[in-house]
A protein has these predicted regions:
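Right-handed parallel beta-helix
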Residues: 132-140, 154-167, 188, 194-211, ...
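Secretory targeting and sorting signals
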Residues: 1-9
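Extracellular beta-rich repeat passengers
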Residues: 284-410
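Helix-rich interaction surfaces within compact, conserved domain-sized segments
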Residues: 60, 192-193, 198, 311, ...
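Short, flexible helix-coil linker/hinge segments at the edges of structured domains or between repeats
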Residues: 172-183, 209-223
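Extracellular beta-strand-rich solenoid/capping regions of secreted or surface-exposed proteins
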Residues: 49-56, 71-135, 143-159, 165-176, ...
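Acidic glycine-/aspartate-rich tracts in secreted/extracellular proteins
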Residues: 45, 66-69, 141, 329
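Acidic Gly/Asp/Thr-rich repetitive segments characteristic of extracellular carbohydrate-active
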Residues: 19-62
Length: 410
């Protein structure tokens, strides 16, 4: 028996998304699973087997305890050295591609090829695909550590999970990324790749203790990519009541400026989420009609912050009734970033500066006053799939009390 999200006292895996709750409205996941297709897992090998079983058949997977991703087929821990190709070592890589001698040419050659093979070795263990008609629910304090769940199917629900520290042992140096080059890594905690009808609800996303401060070539040796990315023609997604925190690149909706797979898709609802100590991409959008409402943004300091709303190519962000708490040193115009987009709807925003009282802020006007070219206000659509729109003044209390795992089942 499938029941709507508002229902209480029912088996968590049978809960479905309500008929008006964002772009993924009506998503059922594995709610129709037969009893034989309901499994509880506590190891990576068990999770992989449960997700791969009976492709397309409705299934419910309950996660108990902490599942480690960096393990072998028998769930024994593996280190970065265990994944490394025999021809790869970090000291040799640093010596080969030092910008002082290598310059601005894209990295290539045997050492880069060995790094790529090393990365593929790790990916074979830490990336698990989630197919169609699947519900994955955490029990208690369930955690996925060092794992990437990659949703590639239709009709998927992921709830009550802690996604932590999906890290890349083998970042790549890109001398052309920015003025000084950058280290780039693979692996998001949760990846939606060509996925449709997906509900991501009451989860926690972060880096755990792996905050990383090592630098090479004067740039942070970045072992993390995104927390939650929605890319490659994914569509009809609702992201609700999650905590996303202590991370740089947070939520990317659309990964390329090319329209090949994304035009007319990437329709996403982002509501009642808490973004705390986030550097950027909350979210950054290309192409999609994205409804961003009733979210709580906490920016504790300026040094690690870049922006919150990224206005990308052909994006159509409709932001309303969001609440920001920011430091006094952060200009209001910095909350929005231009990424080749042209329009932004932003109404009902409240901003509290420091410990001050919140006040209404016109995000679009603040951005336009500080930047050229101006963004226009007409995004060409109005959201209708909204079960409840809270006034921004109520957002801090509601989201603080309700977002994240352990609060999903009332």
């Amino acid at each position: 028996m499938a029941v709507p999200a508002a229902a209480h006292g029912v088996e968590p895996g049978r809960v479905v998304l309500g008929a008006r709750d964002g772009w993924a409205a009506g998503t059922t996941g594995g709610a129709a699973a037969a009893p034989r297709d309901v499994r509880t897992v506590s190891k990576r090998s068990e999770l992989a087997a449960a997700l791969a079983a009976k492709p397309g058949v409705p299934k419910i997977v309950y996660v108990r305890g902490t599942i480690e991703g960096n393990v072998d087929a028998r769930d024994r821990p593996k280190s970065c050295d265990d994944f490394a190709d025999p021809a790869y070592s970090l000291p040799a890589y640093l010596a080969q591609y030092d910008p002082a001698t290598w310059g601005k040419t894209p990295v290539s050659g045997p050492l880069e090829e060995a790094r790529a093979r090393s990365q593929a070795n790790q990916a074979a263990q830490v990336v698990l695909d989630v197919g169609p008609n699947t519900t994955v629910v955490g029990l208690g304090g369930a955690k996925l550590h060092g794992l990437t769940l990659r949703v590639t199917g239709d009709n998927v629900i992921l709830r009550n999970l802690r996604f932590e520290d999906a890290h890349d042992c083998f970042p790549q140096w890109d001398p052309l990324d920015g003025a000084d080059g950058n280290w780039n890594s693979e692996y998001d905690n949760l990846d939606l790749v060509g996925a449709t009808h997906v509900w991501v609800d009451h989860n926690d996303f972060g880096d755990g203790d792996n905050t990383g401060s090592v630098e090479y070539f004067g740039r942070k040796y970045e072992v993390h990519d995104g927390l939650l990315d929605i890319v490659t023609g994914s569509d009809l997604v609702t992201v609700s009541w999650n905590r996303l925190h202590d991370h740089d690149k947070t939520m990317l909706i659309g990964s390329t400026d090319r329209p090949d797979a994304d035009a007319g898709k990437l329709r996403v609802t982002v509501h009642h989420n808490e973004f705390t100590n986030i550097g950027q991409r909350a979210p950054r959008v290309r192409y999609g009609q994205v409804h961003v409402y009733n979210n709580l943004y906490r920016v504790p300091e300026v040094a690690s912050y870049t922006y919150s709303l990224g206005v990308g190519v052909e994006s159509r962000i409709y932001a309303e009734e969001n609440f920001f708490r920011i430091p006094a040193a952060l200009p209001l115009g910095a909350l929005v970033e231009y990424w080749k987009g042209t329009v932004l709807h932003a109404t009902g925003t409240l901003v509290a500066v420091g410990h001050g009282r919140p006040r209404p802020v016109d995000l679009l006007a603040e951005y336009n006053a500080a930047n050229d070219p101006d963004l226009g206000p007409d995004v060409g659509w109005t959201p209708t799939l909204v079960p409840r729109l809270d006034p921004a003044r109520e957002v801090p209390a509601r989201v603080t009390a309700g977002a994240g795992p352990g609060r999903a089942f009332g």
